[in-house]
Amino acid sequence: EKTIADAERCMRELPDDTVAAEYLTPFSSGGVSFDVMANPKLLEEAYNLDTTLIRDLVVQLQLEYDYLIIDTTSTFSALNLSLMDLSTVIDFIGIVDFIPTIKNMKRGSDALKELGYDDNKIRYVLNRSNARTRINVKDVEAILGHQFHYVIPNDFQTAAESIKTGVPLVLSAKDTPLAKGIRTMVDTYEEDTASPQKSQEGGWLSRLFS
């Protein structure tokens, strides 16, 4: 299995001959197909990824695909900032299970403002919203200065099973509140970015979240 570290290594050694799509792993289930670029296998590889080279790989893929979904770490590293600059939408995901996580969310929200990102580019997402906690969501929104655009229900068992099997839960557990919450969120992205013609035809994203 090829990883993003392998793609970055090739980009460094053979910049003119590197094809990012060759480092993707195809996935197909239930009539839905998409491609994934796997994480580095080694921790040191993850820490040593070159920002410029990764950015070049992403730009290549942007020319090949209608949608790219990038799962970043929860830090404002040079790499993550570069990827956010390339993004159409930034999902700022948080959990309000205890005070330290709320403080981290506040710091992250403030950092996004200081970095000058347009509010229309950022979507605030509350994850595991019905987890047992005495913290009032409205209080958290007041602290952040933003309402949550999307609320994703808490369903640890369904999420864990999806991770274990490697099958997206929107396919394997499509009738659960968790899957429905994710589909609702993604539907708004399609409405914002898809042209009328593409919306009528329906792409893999539509099939995945339908």
Give the ranges of each region predicted by the language model.
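Phosphate-binding loop that captures ATP/GTP phosphates
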Residues: 1-36, 150
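Phosphate-binding/switch loop-helix module in NTP-utilizing enzymes
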Residues: 33-80
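Inter-motif core of Ras-like GTPase G domains
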Residues: 60-63, 77-98
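G-domain G4 guanine-recognition motif of GTPases
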Residues: 95-97, 122-134, 151-158
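Conserved C-terminal guanine-recognition region of P-loop GTPase G domains, centered on the G4
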Residues: 102-121
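Beta-strand-loop-alpha "switch" segments that mediate conformational coupling across diverse proteins
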Residues: 128, 141-169, 182
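NTP-binding/hydrolysis catalytic cores, primarily Walker-type P-loop NTPases
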Residues: 164-210
